[in-house]
Amino acid sequence: MRSVGLSILVKKLKKIITAPVEGLGYELVGIEFIQSRQSVLRIYIDHEEGVTVDSCADVSKEVSLVLDVEDPITVPYNLEISSPGLDRPLFTARHYAQFIGEKVNLMLRMAIQNQRKWQGIIKSVDGESIIVAVNQKDEVFALSNIQKANLVPHF
């Protein structure tokens, strides 16, 4: 499945599973669909009191019911429900704004300065792009060019 088709699928999935997730009291943080021999639909949820294994099981049951009816994915896949974890994925401008000052790993769709992988500190967000301090230099990244972003946990 190409990137554009994948993007459309993720938008469709978000539309049909947001209500069941929020109905159980959780925030839908993001969705990843990884297509391979063993395709995976990964749904990240969060809650102010944390996410437990039982939370994930409850959400999995509700989401499975909706997916069985809507049937938006045409290939076999495994459903995973997960908390964002220490290396929390960032999906929206709001997520980046929430973690200003934190270290982030970025994977870009299209290279900038012949580079697709970047790491730095999130400095600001304007809705369309983010500014990340990379080696004491500010770099601007369009949100639309970010394929994947994760916080870098500190230990």
Curated annotation (Swiss-Prot):
The reply on keyword Cytoplasm is yes
Gene from which this protein is expressed: rimP
Look up the record and report any one GO term of the cellular component aspect: cytosol
Question: Among its keywords, does the record have Endoplasmic reticulum?
Answer: no
Say which family it is in.
Belongs to the RimP family.
Record's protein name: Ribosome maturation factor RimP
| Signal sequence range | none
Compartments in which it is found: Cytoplasm
Q: What does this protein do?
A: Required for maturation of 30S ribosomal subunits.
Q: Which UniProt key words apply to this protein?
A: Cytoplasm, Ribosome biogenesis
Q: Which GO terms describe its biological process?
A: ribosomal small subunit assembly; translation
